[in-house]
């Protein structure tokens, strides 16, 4: 992804490709989204979600199939893009990636069903929700391909697709996993020498759960409204949604700083 991006930058001044750099922007974006973000999140999620659920479920062969299907889909997309095949051919790589996501969803579902921890906290719920939210850009992409094939490009669908990728499952798993991992990291840094000398705070007490809940509500409401505003082209809805997402970001940063600036306390 980095090499392609660098080549596209040089292509602005020195012709390296047959077309201008903007023509290859879609290829570069999907190499980053699928080849980097998606594989990274699935890799991290496949380890952290079962771990925090305290689940005994494991299935390495299924995860290998997820990995293979995603990479096959990405390679097929790059081939079709470079050779400018008809738009309906793009349904094949979409089908491969969709199958991979369904398999990963099955993996997470089995991990959830075989969990030892029966009560699931809000942070993990958001992380699990991010897995379900992966379906939204896939659905929009299928609609977008069919629309492009039948009636031409639909800018609103393109914008909604991009938004649901970056502000959907990517943002959701970051919001959830931040408050599952960061408190443990800071707790270990602050209290690793004090453990056993007295009662120390629980890692989950290093941040405000009420603020996290408020952040989650603002984020999900803002996300739904923003997608609605894009599809309906209603500026007022977009403005309200942007405000809600901004407030969610403020609460997120407040809680993160609360964790980072935590001072030692023996109870």
Model-identified regions with their sequence ranges:
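Hydrophobic alpha-helical transmembrane segments of multi-pass integral membrane proteins
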Residues: 1-267
């Amino acid at each position: 992804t980095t090499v392609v991006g660098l080549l596209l930058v040089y292509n602005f001044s020195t012709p390296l490709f047959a077309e201008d750099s903007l023509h290859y922007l879609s290829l570069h974006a999907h190499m980053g989204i699928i080849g980097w973000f998606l594989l990274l999140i699935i890799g991290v999620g496949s380890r952290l979600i079962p771990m925090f659920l305290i689940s005994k479920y494991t299935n390495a062969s299924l995860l290998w199939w997820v990995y293979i299907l995603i990479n096959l889909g990405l390679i097929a997309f790059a081939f079709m893009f470079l050779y400018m095949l008809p738009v309906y051919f793009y349904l094949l790589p979409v089908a491969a990636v969709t199958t991979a996501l369904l398999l990963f969803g099955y993996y997470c579902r089995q991990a959830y069903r075989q969990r030892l921890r029966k009560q699931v906290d809000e942070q993990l719920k958001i992380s699990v929700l991010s897995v379900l939210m992966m379906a939204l850009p896939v659905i929009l992409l299928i609609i977008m391909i069919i629309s492009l094939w039948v009636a031409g490009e639909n800018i609103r669908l393109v914008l909604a697709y991009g938004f649901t990728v970056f502000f959907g499952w990517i943002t959701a798993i970051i919001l959830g996993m931040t408050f599952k991992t960061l408190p443990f990291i800071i707790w270990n840094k602050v209290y690793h020498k004090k453990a056993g000398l007295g009662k120390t705070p629980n890692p989950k007490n290093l941040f405000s759960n009420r603020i996290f809940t408020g952040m989650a509500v603002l984020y999900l409401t803002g996300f739904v409204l923003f997608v609605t505003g894009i599809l309906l082209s209603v500026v007022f809805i977009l403005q309200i949604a942007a405000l809600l997402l901004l407030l969610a970001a403020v609460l997120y940063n407040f809680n993160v700083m609360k964790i980072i600036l935590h001072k030692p306390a023996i109870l």
